[in-house]
């Protein structure tokens, strides 16, 4: 990712975060912002993938779901779950929620169903543990979002609209790098405002680099790297990269951080 694109992405992300900043603490709006970023990513990822596998049939993902070919729907769903680990029907996509916003509708019930549907799609699958409780920290009924239902709806709608203008480069080979950079940048910014509490989910890059250098001192290559409280995974991955580790292991009780791009990459290693 070019430095220009990186700076543009970070500027857009921080603009989104500022929409929530006045309503809640840094750690609270971190969970909302990162949760919605990941929802957008998952939605765009699956729509792109589904359209690609349907290309030879000259039909789009949304067109299939508007049709009556139940066998084709099931085939698409199974292939998505097998290769992506989850499934989202078109009516629960991020883009569909944006359409509801444009119609001035109350999106909160639909948004809540959409987030739950993503988790439910993995039940009984190998990816169930990865997605279980993914959006559990997104309390759309929280009084921190506003006093009335209309206030909450407007605030969340504003955040989703702002995020909608962000391009995560899904059609590029480095899409995970772009999303991972977005996560690390946002977490670092939230950490700056969270004070001492930030230590539970983020280790500053400078500290991570020093710790990584200490760990690999006198070693040419690391066999395994393990972090029992890996948070967002930034320290673990930095150490693994510096030490050219063969395997990476981490534990994290916070669902949102556990399922962020860094730990997901970590589990694939």
Regions found by a protein language model. Name each.
Residues 197-261:
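Conserved S-adenosyl-L-methionine
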Residues 1-215:
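Non-catalytic, mostly N-terminal accessory regions of nucleic-acid modification and defense proteins
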Residues 262-265, 269:
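Positively charged, low-complexity/disordered segments
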């Amino acid at each position: 990712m070019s430095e220009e694109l990186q700076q543009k992405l970070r500027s857009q992300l921080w603009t989104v975060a500022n929409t929530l900043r006045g309503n809640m603490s840094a750690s609270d709006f971190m969970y909302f912002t990162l949760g919605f970023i990941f929802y957008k990513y998952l939605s765009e990822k699956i729509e792109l993938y589904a359209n690609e596998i349907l290309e030879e049939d000259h039909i789009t993902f949304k067109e299939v779901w508007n049709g009556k070919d139940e066998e084709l729907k099931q085939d698409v769903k199974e292939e998505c779950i097998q290769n992506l680990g989850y499934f989202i029907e078109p009516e629960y996509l991020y883009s569909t929620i944006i359409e509801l916003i444009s119609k001035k509708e109350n999106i909160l019930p639909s948004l809540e169903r959409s987030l739950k549907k993503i988790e439910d799609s993995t039940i009984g699958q190998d990816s169930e543990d990865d997605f279980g409780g993914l959006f559990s920290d997104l309390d759309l009924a929280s009084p921190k979002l506003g006093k009335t239902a209309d206030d909450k709806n407007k605030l969340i709608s504003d955040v989703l609209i702002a995020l909608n203008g962000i391009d995560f480069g899904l059609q590029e080979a480095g899409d995970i790098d772009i999303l991972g950079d977005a996560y690390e940048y946002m977490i670092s910014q939230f950490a700056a405002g969270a004070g001492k509490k930030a230590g539970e989910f983020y280790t500053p890059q400078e500290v991570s680099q020093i710790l990584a250098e200490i760990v690999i001192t006198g070693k040419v290559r690391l066999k395994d790297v393990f972090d029992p409280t890996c948070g967002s995974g930034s320290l673990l991955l930095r150490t693994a990269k510096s030490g050219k580790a063969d395997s990476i292991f981490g534990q994290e009780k916070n669902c949102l951080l556990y399922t962020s791009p860094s730990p997901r990459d970590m589990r694939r290693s």
